[in-house]
Amino acid sequence: MAHKKAGGSTRNGRDSNAQRLGIKCFGGELIPAGSIIVRQRGTKFHPGKNVGCGKDHTIFATVKGKVEFKKKGIKKRTYINIVR
C-alpha cells in the first residue's frame, strides 16, 4: 500500500507588487515641466527651486530645465532643484 495521505495546505505563497519607487530622472538630465523626478516614501529628497512635492512625497518639476541634486544645511539634506 504505497499511498500518501493527504498533505496539509500551507498559508504562504503570496507576495505584494513592487512599488516602483526611486529616482526617475538623474542629475544633469534635461526634463520638461511636470516630469516626476523621484518617487519616495517620506522626504528622503527635499524639494528645492522650481520643484514641487506631491501628497505622497513625489518630487516633480514645475518648469523645464536641468535636474540638480544639492546637499545643504547642518543635516546635509539632499535638495533637488531645476536649473533653467
Curated annotation (Swiss-Prot):
Keyword Transmembrane: no
BP GO terms, sorted: translation
Top-level lineage group: Bacteria
Any one annotated GO CC term: cytosolic large ribosomal subunit
Presence of keyword Ribonucleoprotein: yes
GO molecular function per UniProt: structural constituent of ribosome
Key words, A-Z: Ribonucleoprotein, Ribosomal protein
Stored InterPro entries: Ribosomal_bL27, Ribosomal_bL27_CS
Protein family membership: Belongs to the bacterial ribosomal protein bL27 family.
PANTHER family, per database record: LARGE RIBOSOMAL SUBUNIT PROTEIN BL27M, RIBOSOMAL PROTEIN L27
NCBIfam families: L27
Name of this chain's protein: Large ribosomal subunit protein bL27
Annotated organism of origin: Buchnera aphidicola subsp. Schizaphis graminum (strain Sg)
